[in-house]
Amino acid sequence: MTTKLEDKHAGNGDLVGEGQPYLGEKYQTNGKPVANGRGEISVKQEANGKCGVPRKSLNMYSWQEIQKHNQKADQWLVINRKVYDVTGWANKHPGGSRVLNHYAGEDATDVFRAMHLDLDIVKLYLKPLLIGELAPEEPSQERHKSSQLVEDFRELRRTLEAMNMFKVNPVFFFLHFAQIMILETLAWLIVWHFGSGWPVTIFISFLLTISQVQCFLLQHDLGHISVFPKSKWSRLMQKFMMSHLKGLSTCWWNHRHFQHHVKTNIYPKDPDINTGPLFVNGYLKPVQVWEMKLCPGHLTVNYFSLQEFAWVSSFYIHYFIMFGPFYGIFGTILLIFLVKFLESPWVAYVTQMSHVPMRISKEENRDWLSAQVLATCNVEQSFFNDWFTGHLNFQIEHHLFPTMPCHNYHKVAPLVRSLCAKHGLQYVNKPLLKSLSARSSHFPLTACLHTIHWLVNHLPISYLLRDICMPSMDVRPFREHQQCNVKK
């Protein structure tokens, strides 16, 4: 059962609140638009011909009604008690349609705040999608969630914002970038001066491996728009780091990584724990029958836009320019494979150590703090651990505050630990070499399978093989979503 609520406009014509007519709305014969048939907008006109104070009549909904709209063809979500119908807009979402679908029928207030940098810009997209709000008697989050825990976490975020914990230190990221470029330049200078013998090749392979891993870690920060004040700058620099310097698709990475963040260790919503194409393992993963579909619809050309292809191709071009004169075409290809082979275990360990040993479950619709803490663990801090993991040893803090610069994680960790202790949540912090260990004897095998899956998925030859042989992984870049990125 729904009732109606009226939002009035201020005298300057600006709406007080977030509602505007839905762009795809239908109109009644009297000229009043109806947002999906569930709300009305009426505008009074004064005698002088000017519009008077417009009013928007919005429906009020119960959680029981909202939770029914959790399908791909019918997606509602709640942000700050406002109800939005994102069904028709999901495919235009810059973060990918699946991110919205994963929260259909749920409260998305905290994940919305966590994943976006400039809320004023993002809210412009929300206004046309507004269809109502929660009824006054309804809590601000689902009834099974602890309102005190949710409010305490939001108070923590406000405290961190007041402490400038989301402020970037440009020197830190400049030094990180300089490290990458110096290592790559040094590798070229060594080959140029000493030749391309085996000892030199092995040595520069290790230099390039370090450069590639650190490049991956920096692009990860850029992907979370935690480096530059404008998301457009971060996206452009991420393309340079991920595609030009590493030869990987940023669209593919973001498409999967954003899903991992919003539904960490939730099967099958988190693509990072889906080993189905290679292994069927774990307690929650049913036996899946899948077929190899060799057809044009699954060829690589279908997945990459020309822009993505150009960016990724530039990686191979610059490698051939740098090392081709010393190794030739075939030798340069082998060098690339060697570096990728050495890099993959390092990156796999960093990305898997904090999640694979933790709780993996089906959808439980937990609050943001509980969901991230139960699915994530930290690794003890040291100068080496910070460098080796790109500060992802503070994975709990990173998942709670993705847009926070990584150099501030260690500062906020004590506050997060204190909040977890207050609400009885286990804050797990392990030594680096024991980070993949877990209580259950089954987890080492699971961790091994996840790591092998990640390795195969990130070796160079797999970029072609997975598109042809593993269509179930859905690695399509969401280029159509990025085309509607906000220009800032």
Where do the model's predicted regions map?
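Alpha-helical bilayer-embedded segments of polytopic membrane proteins, i.e.
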Residues: 168-215, 242-246, 293, 300-350, ...
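Conserved oxyanion/phosphate-binding beta-strand-loop segments in alpha/beta enzyme cores
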Residues: 150-159, 164, 182, 186-190, ...
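Short coil/turn segments at secondary-structure boundaries
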Residues: 138-139, 170-176, 254-256, 270-274
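Transmembrane alpha-helix/helix-exit interface in multi-pass inner-membrane proteins
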Residues: 347-364
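Membrane-embedded catalytic scaffold of the fatty acid hydroxylase/desaturase
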Residues: 205-307, 359-485
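Active-site rim elements
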Residues: 112-113, 332-334, 400-405
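Divalent metal-coordination and catalytic microenvironments
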Residues: 81, 122, 160, 220, ...
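B-type heme-binding environments
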Residues: 2-166
